[in-house]
């Protein structure tokens, strides 16, 4: 009978097989996290395009539809607020995905340090965020939302009188 914490010789192959399966799972999760960022961006692009198109349709057609200018302006502002909410939601999902990626990569490094040897894989450094595509996805979302609000504030809303 083995003492708790003591490894039996026949347990080493089982342990290595378990580590290999866990490593495969971690790599699959890292791949999924990477794919999800693009799915979230596609979600943002689709919803933002639809909402901004509705705002532009409201801007172009509010007179023909006999809407009061104040009502049309409120509609444009409401649609842009929805775009902002979608952008915030998408940004949150991207940030959470990046944090998950860091966690999975650290777990990957733990496994390789134990099974292969220390330093086999270097740990990710959050200071390298300028090399992460998530950084630029977030910048794109931020710049696009700011641009939409500025275009509405300086061109659309003043023209709706």
Functional labels for PLM-detected ranges:
Residues 3-65, 86:
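Cytosol/matrix-facing amphipathic helices and coiled-coil assembly/linker segments
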Residues 49-52, 83-94, 144-149:
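Helical transmembrane-bundle signal
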Residues 57-74, 159-161:
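Membrane-interfacial hairpin junctions
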Residues 8-17, 21, 105-132:
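Solvent-exposed, non-transmembrane helices and loops of integral membrane proteins
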Residues 36, 40, 65-122:
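Inner-leaflet juxtamembrane helices
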Residues 34, 120-146:
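Loop-to-transmembrane boundary segments
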Residues 1-14, 95-105:
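Short, non-transmembrane cytosolic segments of multipass membrane proteins
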Residues 147-161:
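Juxtamembrane boundary at the C-terminal end of a transmembrane helix
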């Amino acid at each position: 009978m083995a003492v708790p914490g003591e490894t039996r010789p026949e347990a080493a192959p089982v342990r290595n097989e378990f580590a290999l399966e866990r490593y495969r799972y971690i790599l699959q999760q890292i791949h999924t996290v990477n794919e999800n960022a693009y799915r979230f961006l596609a979600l943002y692009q689709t919803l933002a395009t639809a909402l901004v198109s509705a705002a532009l349709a409201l801007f172009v057609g509010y007179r023909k539809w006999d809407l009061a200018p104040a009502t049309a302006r409120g509609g444009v502002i409401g649609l842009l607020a929805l775009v902002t909410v979608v952008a915030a939601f998408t940004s949150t999902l991207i940030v959470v995905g990046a944090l998950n990626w860091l966690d999975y990569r650290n777990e990957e490094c733990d496994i390789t340090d134990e099974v292969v040897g220390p330093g086999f894989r270097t740990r990710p450094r959050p200071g390298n965020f300028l090399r992460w595509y998530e950084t630029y996805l977030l910048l794109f979302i931020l710049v696009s939302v700011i641009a939409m609000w500025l275009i509405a504030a300086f061109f659309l809303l003043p023209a709706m009188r």
